[in-house]
A protein has these predicted regions:
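Bacterial N-terminal signal peptides
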Residues: 15-26
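Short, Φ-rich (hydrophobic/aromatic) sequence segments
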Residues: 4, 21, 306-307
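N-terminal secretory signal peptides that target proteins for export/translocation
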Residues: 1-11
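Serine/threonine-rich, low-complexity intrinsically disordered segments
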Residues: 7, 17, 29-30
Length: 346
């Protein structure tokens, strides 16, 4: 008897888990509720603070030795950096401040904040339970639609959220299983989903497509670690499908013809229709946040003023960035805990 490879064992595990979820759904909910059972958590409880020891609580903000004479140290995720960096530089010049800006990821932001090595951290996901450090406050600056996109040669222009979940789980395996706008069918070739399963312990983002990584069980699934790799795979593969904010696509490929990708409508709605994202018709999005500290030896008044300034500037930002600002989110009935977005509208 042949030994099963670790990849095959992983695939079997994912498939069994997915079948268990479907079986549970089929016996407990109506058909039109199925999608919500596969959707992951949107936010974490804001009042549940992660415990740290006494030495950590007493520790002041201390910059890394490579950073000299800074008034502020900021670390931003790769989604916020291209938007916020020029605004911060302008603010620093106008106010005579020396501000050190680091481009990283949510994980890098979390690491620097847990070391108390930064005044402000930037996230592209809602905070996970371990991100909620004592004295750390989250300030949402906007949300951005997470687009499903395919190679520009693909004739498909729309999928339902149910079909998207079936594609990434492997239940739909060929493009011919999905009707296109003209009434015909796509290629009979295998769909090749591409997934970037980052920030696994933080809610929102890809968890809104499928709740956990084991549900991404398509046999032809390819995992990538970087946004550029995601875009490159789909640019070069007519059978591929992936997801990301289209702002990220435009950042790495300013010339749309170079990226060779196009966004699909989801449930008939486009990623660039803010009203449909706000009312819940478009169900996939990122939550963009900044942090500040409150408390003795950790609070920096420059940080509070800068975060307020950035929030105001993003209210007026060009629509090409695809960010829906806080004022519109509040007006649409989304829930906030202080300045932190913490719930979708009912």
């Amino acid at each position: 008897m042949k030994m099963l490879t670790s990849r095959k064992l992983r695939l079997i595990k994912r498939t069994l888990l997915y079948l268990q979820v479907l079986l549970f759904i089929g016996t407990t909910v109506h058909a039109n509720d199925t999608n919500e059972e596969l959707r992951g958590a949107t936010f974490t409880e804001p009042t549940k603070i992660f415990e740290m020891d006494t030495d950590w609580l007493k520790k002041p903000i201390t910059y890394d030795t490579s950073i000299e004479n800074a008034d502020l140290v900021i670390t931003l995720g790769q989604h916020l950096y291209p938007i916020a960096e020029p605004i911060i530089k302008k603010y620093a010049k106008e106010h005579g401040l020396k501000i050190f800006i680091n481009e990283g990821t949510c994980g890098i932001s979390a690491g620097m904040l847990s070391r108390k090595a930064a005044d402000i951290g930037g996230y592209c996901c809602p905070p996970g339970e371990t991100d909620r450090l004592p004295g750390l406050k989250f300030h949402t600056v906007g949300i951005a639609a997470l687009a499903l996109f395919v190679n520009h040669s693909n004739p498909l222009d729309n999928v339902s959220i149910e079909q998207a979940r079936q594609i990434f789980s492997g239940e739909i395996s060929r493009w011919s299983e999905i009707k296109i706008a003209s009434g015909g069918k796509g290629s009979n070739k295998l769909i090749q989903p591409v997934a970037r399963l980052h920030c696994k312990l933080r809610p929102g983002h890809w968890h809104l497509l499928l709740a956990n990584e084991d549900l991404f069980s398509s046999p032809s699934l390819q995992e990538v670690g970087a946004i550029q790799d995601m875009i490159s795979q789909i640019s070069n593969n007519p059978m591929a499908i992936g997801y990301e904010t289209m702002t990220s696509v435009h950042r790495y490929y300013p010339n749309e013809n170079e990226s060779k990708v196009k966004a699909l409508k989801l449930n008939g709605y486009s990623h660039n229709e803010p009203s449909e994202l706000l009312n819940g018709n478009y169900p996939l999005y990122r939550t963009l946040s900044l942090t500040t500290w409150e408390g003795e030896d950790i609070q920096n008044s420059h940080a509070t003023k800068l975060v307020n300034y950035l929030t105001q500037q993003i209210e007026q930002i060009d629509s090409k960035f695809g960010i829906v600002p806080v004022s519109q989110i509040r007006k649409a009935g989304w829930k906030f805990y202080g300045n932190e977005l913490n719930g979708e509208p009912e």
